[in-house]
């Protein structure tokens, strides 16, 4: 029976609007975030030599990862105190005097100092560029390479942020592509410091004109991304954002109704339909004052290159200082590119899949060298070097044994974003390009992933006997390991995580 890997990912982001002091004439009153975003990695990512590829046998298609992402914006009824920030704004321009020629200046020494005493100056609105649905040909040519490098850097940063919020020696799975897609859609309507801080977190170049077009181009035969916007009737979304979102993300905004239960069913139904019903309930509840929901779903479909052995086997797996017996899947001819990495002190193996996708496993080599030691040594530079070396390595028929995997991972994303030193969702959110409402705040953000790797993906497959010499390469996975689902065409991780207990 051939094997199937089915990761599913959910991301829920709740945003609230603080209307306790909102000025109906104002468009934004955000202040500069005092925290500096962390530095970006600028390592270049080299091209791959795909001159060798093993023949692909006829194998029935299997189901692979599914990802869903949601942002929910609600009206904030907690009355957040922010009058101090608001009072620092200048008076409206209409209240400032315009001195006529020849009129003597006011005597500041004899009159109280007021706004009318100040010289007339043009008011400066917060920087809020309109969403760009077009980019130049010259920018488009280099945008995919920039995006793949940025996604790689972001994925490694995100891995460490997730790991820092998880308990030691626990399973973990997430989709960097899903989270980046969500944040990039937020970036489409971001202004001022929120825009620059998002660019920094995502490792994007400043004013990356073609990022949305490039992200749209990363949807291929094996990776499909779809988006949808839901909003309340009383939320005024800018036409420029609606048009750009339709052009770039293929979503026409849908209006929510007055019934929260009906809205909840509407949103969860959309998620289920766009994740092949792998994710049936993204939201457990929906606040009655919800004003905006942004959704993103990523669906992957791939198949193994070679069928696995139909017989079932149990084998030992090292878990928490003891050995446990877990179901294993095996193949005597699976195409694997592998090498030992001295920096990580780990064996790296790349399992070839269809649609230019691959499953990469990093497992410690020495018994005393644990997975946490591998994680500590992993940084964007090391990660890119590993992927480059894999690109130059040949896929050879290999005796492969690896466990059936079931991983469920749920994560509060606000804590992850704070580990990344991004605080705008909590303190200073500026979405002036999305709506004229200046008072939005994130109240919750959640990411959920389910990863399943089994042998039940294909009903029937042809078996063929092939004899190999004693020098057949071996790749065995019997210890906790790090994994990623790699898009070989666009060179970025779609899913990442670690497995301590294959049983889930």
Swiss-Prot record:
PROSITE patterns listed in its UniProt record: SERPIN (PS00284)
Nucleus keyword on record: no
Residue ranges, annotated region (Disordered): 22-67, 85-141
Site (Reactive bond): 470-471
UniProt-recorded Gene Ontology molecular function terms: serine-type endopeptidase inhibitor activity
Polar residues compositional bias, start-end: 85-124
Keyword line: Blood coagulation, Disulfide bond, Fibrinolysis, Glycoprotein, Hemostasis, Protease inhibitor, Secreted, Serine protease inhibitor, Signal
SMART domains associated with the record: SERPIN (SM00093)
Gene3D superfamilies: Alpha-1-antitrypsin, domain 1, Antithrombin, subunit I, domain 2
First-listed, main subcellular location of the protein, grouped into a coarse class: secreted
Matching InterPro entries: Serpin_CS, Serpin_dom, Serpin_fam, Serpin_sf, Serpin_sf_1, Serpin_sf_2
One of the GO BP terms on file: innate immune response
One Gene Ontology CC term in the entry: extracellular space
Positions with biased composition (Basic and acidic residues): 39-51
Disulfide cysteine pairs (residue numbers): 128-432, 135-210
UniProt subcellular location: Secreted
Role this protein plays: Serine protease inhibitor, which acrs as a regulator of the classical complement pathway. Forms a proteolytically inactive stoichiometric complex with the C1r or C1s proteases. May also regulate blood coagulation, fibrinolysis and the generation of kinins. Very efficient inhibitor of FXIIa. Inhibits chymotrypsin and kallikrein.
Membership in a protein family: Belongs to the serpin family.
Stated name of the protein: Plasma protease C1 inhibitor
Source organism: Mus musculus
């Amino acid at each position: 029976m051939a094997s199937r890997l089915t990761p599913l990912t959910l991301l829920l982001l709740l945003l609230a609007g603080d209307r306790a002091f909102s000025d109906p004439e104002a468009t934004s009153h955000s202040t500069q975030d005092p925290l500096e975003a962390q530095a970006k990695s600028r390592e270049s990512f080299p091209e791959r030599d795909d001159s060798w590829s093993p023949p692909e046998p006829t194998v029935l298609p299997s189901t692979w990862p599914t990802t869903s992402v949601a942002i929910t914006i609600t009206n904030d009824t907690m009355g957040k105190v922010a009058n101090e920030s608001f009072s620092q704004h200048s008076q409206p321009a209409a209240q400032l005097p315009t001195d006529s020629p020849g009129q003597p200046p006011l005597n500041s020494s004899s009159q109280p100092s007021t706004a009318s005493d100040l010289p007339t100056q043009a008011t400066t609105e917060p920087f809020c560029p309109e969403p760009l649905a077009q980019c130049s040909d010259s920018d488009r040519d280099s945008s995919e390479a920039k995006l793949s490098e940025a996604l790689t850097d972001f994925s490694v940063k995100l891995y460490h942020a997730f790991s820092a919020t998880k308990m030691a020696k626990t399973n973990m799975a997430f989709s960097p592509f899903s989270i980046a897609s969500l944040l990039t859609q937020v970036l489409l309507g971001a202004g001022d410091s929120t825009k620059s801080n998002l660019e920094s977190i995502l490792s994007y170049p400043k004013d990356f004109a073609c990022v949305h077009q490039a992200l749209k181009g990363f949807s291929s035969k094996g990776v499909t991304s779809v988006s949808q916007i839901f909003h309340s009737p009383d939320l005024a979304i800018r036409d420029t954002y609606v048009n750009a979102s339709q052009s770039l993300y293929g979503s026409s905004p849908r209006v929510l109704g007055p019934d929260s239960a009906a809205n909840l069913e509407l949103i969860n139904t959309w998620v289920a339909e766009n994740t092949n019903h792998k994710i049936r309930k993204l939201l457990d509840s929906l606040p009655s004052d919800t004003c905006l929901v942004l959704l993103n779903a990523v669906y992957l479909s791939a198949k193994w290159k070679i069928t696995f052995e139909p017989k079932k086997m149990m084998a030992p797996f090292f878990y928490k200082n003891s050995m446990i017996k877990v179901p294993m899947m095996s193949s005597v001819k699976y195409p694997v590119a592998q090498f030992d990495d001295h920096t990580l002190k780990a064996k790296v193996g790349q399992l070839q899949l269809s649609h230019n996708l691959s499953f990469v496993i990093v497992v410690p080599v020495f018994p005393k060298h644990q997975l946490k030691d591998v994680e500590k040594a992993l940084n964007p530079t090391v990660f890119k070097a590993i992927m480059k070396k894999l690109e130059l390595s040949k896929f050879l028929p290999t005796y492969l044994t690896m466990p059936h995997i079931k991983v469920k991972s749920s994560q509060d994303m606000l804590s992850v974003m704070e580990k990344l030193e991004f605080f705008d969702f909590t303190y200073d959110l500026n979405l002036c390009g999305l709506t004229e409402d200046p008072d939005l705040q994130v109240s919750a953000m959640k990411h959920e992933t389910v990863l399943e790797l089994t042998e039940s993906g294909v009903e029937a497959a042809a078996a063929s006997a092939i004899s190999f010499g004693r020098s057949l390469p071996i790749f065995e996975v019997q210890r906790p390991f790090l994994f990623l689902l790699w898009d070989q065409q666009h060179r970025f991780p779609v899913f990442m995580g670690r497995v301590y207990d294959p049983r889930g």
